[in-house]
């Protein structure tokens, strides 16, 4: 398994973050090209951990798993233990692409009655729903879905990883204990998510004197280090069947949430076939449902295939118009 390529996609569930842009990077980023491989994520400290794993003899999946857990420390909006995602893994020797679905799932108790406090036998009229009523589906404990990230990353490691799980996660545990300097990105993510103050624990972690942690502040996450340490030893069971799950469910129930232990013990990520299309003599693979992005991507490529893009400069108005369409 020397040649291995993968793509991960993470989504958030425990804390919904506004989709509006809140970051204005002061300098443009340009494409980077490498010959022997690279690790790319939304935080350089997490990418550095991926490089560390590769230098220890790990493969791409080992590195991706380490990066996925590290992002829970460095930039939780990009990856965290409370969300879910999708992964594509390409095994060159087999010429095969694997799709892992670890999307977060709605709690078993999630229904209109429990979410909106409706009477079970009451006739539901869509006109009765006001926009502000849907805030409970965007923020807080009722907006939370059963997390799939831990299951998905560990399933990927079990199937394709090379190094022992403890070796993969040890640099992440060290990072959480030693702390990281708050980045501009993380600071802005906290600043644009004031609802984090509504929960005492998230307020304790991400705020200082009632203000978002400032840039370059040393943020340590010893509790998260303990959680990841338990996972490194006990695997999926440590998260979905142990005291970690108990604490999440208790916190949910104490805050009018919908989680039950069965949501955690019954959760499983799954391997599925990716979807694909032909684009200019290339076969493009991507994640299928429940991911909506894959279908959108392949549809866009099929539309673009009818246009001769070589006729236009890469930075021309026509090129940008076609791409944006």
Set out the residue ranges of the language-model regions:
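Bacterial Sec-dependent N-terminal signal peptides
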Residues: 1-20
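Noncatalytic scaffold domains of N-terminal-nucleophile
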Residues: 19-48, 52, 60-61, 65-234, ...
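Internal alpha/beta scaffold segment
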Residues: 275-277, 282-325
């Amino acid at each position: 398994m020397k040649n291995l390529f993968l793509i991960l996609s993470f989504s958030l569930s425990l804390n919904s973050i506004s989709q509006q842009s809140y970051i204005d990077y002061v300098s443009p980023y340009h494409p980077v090209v490498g010959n022997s491989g690279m690790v790319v994520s939304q935080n350089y400290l997490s990418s550095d951990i991926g490089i560390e794993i590769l230098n220890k003899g790990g493969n791409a999946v080992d590195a991706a798993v380490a990066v996925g857990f590290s992002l829970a420390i460095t930039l939780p909006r990009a990856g965290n233990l409370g969300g879910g995602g999708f992964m594509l893994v390409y095994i060159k020797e087999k010429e095969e692409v694997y799709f892992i679905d670890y999307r977060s799932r709605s709690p078993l108790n999630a229904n209109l009655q429990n979410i909106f406090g409706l009477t079970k036998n009451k006739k539901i009229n869509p006109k009765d729903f006001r926009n502000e009523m849907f805030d409970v589906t965007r923020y807080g404990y009722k907006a939370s879905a059963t997390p799939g990230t831990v299951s998905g990353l560990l399933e990927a490691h079990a199937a394709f990883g090379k190094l022992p799980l403890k070796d993969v996660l040890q640099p992440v545990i060290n990072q959480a204990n030693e702390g990281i300097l708050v980045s501009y990105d993380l600071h802005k993510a906290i600043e644009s998510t004031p609802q984090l103050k509504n929960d005492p624990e998230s307020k304790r972690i991400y705020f200082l004197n009632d203000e978002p942690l400032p840039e370059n502040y040393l943020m340590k996450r010893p509790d998260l280090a303990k959680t990841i340490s338990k996972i490194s030893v006990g695997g999926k069971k440590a998260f979905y069947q142990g005291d970690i799950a108990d604490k999440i469910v208790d916190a949910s129930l104490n805050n009018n949430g919908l989680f039950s232990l069965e949501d955690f013990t019954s959760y499983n990520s799954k391997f599925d076939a990716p979807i694909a299309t032909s684009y200019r003599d290339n076969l493009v693979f991507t994640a299928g449902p429940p991911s909506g992005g894959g279908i959108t991507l392949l549809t866009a490529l099929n539309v673009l295939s009818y246009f001769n893009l070589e006729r236009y400069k890469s930075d021309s108005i026509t090129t940008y118009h076609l791409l944006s369409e």
